[in-house]
């Protein structure tokens, strides 16, 4: 299979995150290899933080797909109402969605940010593969702005003051390298 055909296939989430994509290492594998190598290849458990981050990515990159998220009006995930409505599934809370929608509006209303994200020659969720140290790796750029020769990686954080620690914890440096 040619590199172009592989990249075309990896554009589909079911292939990128599914069996086809598992033949490549990714940045998330680095954390697993560093912290628990025996868990390599295992599906990671969903978390509220990743769910919120995923919703934010979708709101910016593919707003037409926001309906796939289940949203529950509840103060926390520990309430009886949430547990009944979620059916054991991890769902977004309405106040989380409200905050993300406000963040999205602010980003897109900013002339610089909105222009870089919605520019003329821009690609979204662009996958790539590379051989590094004899291993095949995959990565996906959230936004590639060709006019500005810029790659944008959207990130969310609960606390801006702890972002530096989060960047270290989640290996954002290696993600940029890949």
Tell me what each language-model feature is.
Residues 1-138:
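Metal-dependent nuclease catalytic cores that hydrolyze phosphodiester bonds in DNA/RNA
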Residues 122, 126-178:
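Mg2+/Mn2+-dependent nuclease catalytic core
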């Amino acid at each position: 299979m040619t590199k172009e055909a592989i990249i075309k296939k990896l554009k589909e989430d079911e292939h990128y995150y599914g069996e086809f994509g598992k033949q490549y290492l990714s940045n998330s594998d680095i954390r697993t290899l560093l912290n628990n190598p025996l868990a390599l290849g295992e599906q990671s458990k969903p978390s509220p933080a990743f769910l919120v981050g995923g919703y934010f990515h979708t709101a910016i990159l593919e707003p037409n797909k926001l309906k796939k998220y289940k949203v529950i009006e509840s103060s926390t995930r520990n309430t009886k109402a949430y547990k009944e409505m979620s059916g054991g599934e991890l769902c977004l809370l309405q106040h989380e969605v409200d905050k993300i929608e406000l963040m999205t509006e602010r980003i897109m209303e900013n002339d610089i940010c909105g222009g870089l994200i919605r520019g003329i020659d821009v690609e979204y969720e662009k996958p790539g593969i590379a051989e590094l140290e004899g291993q095949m790796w995959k990565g996906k750029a959230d936004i590639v702005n060709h006019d500005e020769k810029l790659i944008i990686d959207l990130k969310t954080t609960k606390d801006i003051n702890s972002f530096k620690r989060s960047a270290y914890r989640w290996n954002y440096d290696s993600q940029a390298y890949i």
